[in-house]
Amino acid sequence: MLLFIILSVGVDAISYIQNDRSNDLCIIYEMTSFGASFNNANDSLVKLHRHMGLKYEICKIESNANALTQMQKCNCLYDDTPQIVVFTNFRKSSLKTLIGTENKCELLPQTTIYTPTVDIESEYFIYGNDVKICYLDKNLLGIGCDATDTTSWLDLDAGLPTNHAIDIPEITSDGFKLFAKYGDSFLCQRLMDEPKKQIQFYAEVDNVPSNDVIESSRSWASVWKVVKTVLHFTYHILDLFYGNKRATARMIEHSPLG
């Protein structure tokens, strides 16, 4: 089961979503615009369900909003759905970091200096925007920062306008302090490099995102496969479901996707 727990700072309770539906696929669409091209692809999936019994759940992630908070509404990421397929046409996507591994994330307090409790043997990253850090080990980057004055702190994401994943490369026993300008930034601890579910990532040509920000492990799940359009991605879903490329040709020939 994919684990992505969101914790609120200062709150011990964890909420889990129960979902008894059984799906074949969890389909994630991250798009800059959900227009006619998405509607055509969605119509094709409806026909697949009607004619061939494909069971699926669709999760729509808007690229101009926080992907991590949107993921929490996607039940099939957390239930027993065996396979996840992801499509994006957003070049700055962080979905490979967020979905391709198992992570535990805590919401950072807004405009408040926060000192997290961290495990120096673990890997961490920030998912957010406009977050500053002050390392408490003076031998590290951030030497000279005033722990009480955030204007002297290092900007982790200077110049980037959207929420995204940012690696924290150095973790020592001295720890660090964080300051988040906005209320939807998270500190995430990587629990496992390999997901328990089967996951495949697809990106629209000319909009292939960068690699996982931590990249401590490289596997088939961390490779973006390139497709021409979102409709071509739908054809790949058919191949994945039936395990036979000739199935796509038969479906196109008989026009249930058209």
Curated annotation (Swiss-Prot):
Keyword Ribonucleoprotein: no
Keywords from the UniProt entry: Calcium, Capsid protein, Glycoprotein, Host endoplasmic reticulum, Host membrane, Membrane, Outer capsid protein, T=13 icosahedral capsid protein, Transmembrane, Transmembrane helix, Virion
Membrane topology recorded in Swiss-Prot or TrEMBL: Single-pass membrane protein
Sites carrying sugar chains: N42
Cited Pfam families: Rotavirus_VP7 (PF05868)
Broad class of where this protein is predominantly found: virion
Cellular localisation: Virion; Host rough endoplasmic reticulum membrane
Stretches that traverse the bilayer: 1-13
Cellular component terms (Gene Ontology): host cell rough endoplasmic reticulum membrane; membrane; T=13 icosahedral viral capsid; viral outer capsid
Keyword Transmembrane: yes
Oligomer status and interactors: Homotrimer; in the presence of calcium. Acquisition of the capsid outer layer requires a high calcium concentration inside the endoplasmic reticulum. Following cell entry, the low calcium concentration in the cytoplasm is probably responsible for the solubilization of the outer layer.
Function in brief: Outer capsid protein involved in attachment and possibly entry into the host epithelial cell. It is subsequently lost, together with VP4, following virus entry into the host cell. The outer layer contains 780 copies of VP7, grouped as 260 trimers. Rotavirus attachment and entry into the host cell probably involves multiple sequential contacts between the outer capsid proteins VP4 and VP7, and the cell receptors.
Membership in a protein family: Belongs to the rotavirus VP7 family.
Protein name: Outer capsid glycoprotein VP7
Native species: Rotavirus X (isolate RVX/Human/Bangladesh/NADRV-B219/2002/GXP[X]) (RV ADRV-N)
